[in-house]
Amino acid sequence: ETFETIFHGSEEERFYHEAGEDKGFMEDTGNHDARTEGMSYGMMVCLQLDKKEEFDRLWKWTRTYMYMDEGPGKNYFAWSCALDGTRNADGPAPDGEEYFAMALFFASRRWGDGEGIFNYSREAKAILHECVHKGEPGHPGDPMWEPSNKLIKFVPGLDFSDPSYHLPHFY
């Protein structure tokens, strides 16, 4: 019942909205935007409840609008987008990437890998590779995990963490 309300309830009740033929997003109702945190949590809920269509819609919206293919955040996800997909941010929030990777690994096990962006395990590995290896020789940018202590950062360019980003049950 809760899933149905959040994903398919009335316009006043739901957080999930379909966009076009094959995309969907989770609205942060307090800020009227879509955030990597909410998108990745939505994917995790869909995964746990075996809702592949909604999962794929969320992932496609994320890859279409949030994925950054240039600049310092290249191969990361913009942490906030307007509901039309316009980016509100040029940088990531590492908890989103962390949840995206885990949801994609779980999706690979539940539904198997598909083609393109729906090759879930390949996408998850690519996210984690960027998160860990940015900043190494030949790989510009800042990693999401601090190499010296292995703690996830609050944002890649800063040297402090956020305790809410630590998800030991993922490892």
Regions found by a protein language model. Give the residues of each.
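N-terminal carbohydrate-binding/catalytic regions of secreted carbohydrate-active enzymes
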Residues: E1-E97, A103, R110-D113
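Extended ligand-binding clefts on enzyme/binding-domain cores
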Residues: E1-G9, R14-F15, T29-T36, G71-K74, ...
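Hydrophobic alpha-helical segments with transmembrane-like composition
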Residues: M102-R110, S164-F170
